[in-house]
Amino acid sequence: MTGPGPVLVVGGTGMLGSQVVSRLLTGGKQVRALVRPGSDATRIEALGATIARGDMMEPESLLRAMDGVHAVITSAAGYTHHREGDSPVIDTVGNINLVDAASRAGIRRFVLTSILTCDQTPDVPHFWHKKLAEDRLEELGVPFVALRPGAFLEQITRFGDPFSEGRLMWFGSSSVPLTFVLASDLAGYLAAAVDASGVDGSGSTSAGTSP
């Protein structure tokens, strides 16, 4: 158990993060969401989250957001460029800033959304950057859980009509094994990791079927 204090969700206005916020609130947790200045947070505010304005590129804003917080969950990712302000530096400098702030703030549980096979793919930047974030958590001794999901099924099913046709459309090599996870399932895993026992510093768990 991490304690009675709020959980800070980083990336809480995104597709995955907003579901994490919902799962935590449903489970009776107090939720604080880090939201960039100017970004719309009305959706998660309506759910019951409190908003801390800050930016992963501004370390002092992270410390302010973590004041009184017992756990941090991050689903932030910059490489996708899904929203204004997204940048690959979120995955490098931003993640390191977040981990460093968690260490300084004495966070009792840090839950990282990593990615499957990140430790085997140094030539794939957004995979490898997750591995570097895991390494930084371990280096600083921050109690953490890193979940390594595969691809989101919701993103794959946007192509064609897979349910009526009985097949998925995928762009890539036909010889590379694939693994998928529902974002709603992953949100549940991330929320549950806040209070999971016997996992601090234990490394990473795959969410989904391993290739």
Indicate residue ranges for each PLM-predicted region.
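N-terminal Rossmann NAD(P)H-binding glycine-rich loop of SDR-like oxidoreductase domains
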Residues: 2-29
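NAD(P)H-binding glycine-rich loop region in Rossmannoid oxidoreductase-like domains
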Residues: 8, 35-97, 101-104, 118-119
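Structural signature of the Rossmann-like NAD(P)-dependent dehydrogenase/reductase core
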Residues: 9-10, 74, 109-112, 146, ...
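Conserved dinucleotide-binding and phosphotransfer motif residues
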Residues: 27, 47, 140
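Short beta-strand "acidic-cap" motif of Rossmann-like dinucleotide-binding folds
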Residues: 31-33
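Conserved sequence/active-site signature of Rossmann-fold short-chain dehydrogenase/reductase
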Residues: 57, 152, 209-211
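Glycine-/Pro-rich loop/turn segments that contact NAD(P) or position catalytic residues
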Residues: 78-165
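Substrate-positioning beta->alpha
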Residues: 171-195, 201-202, 208
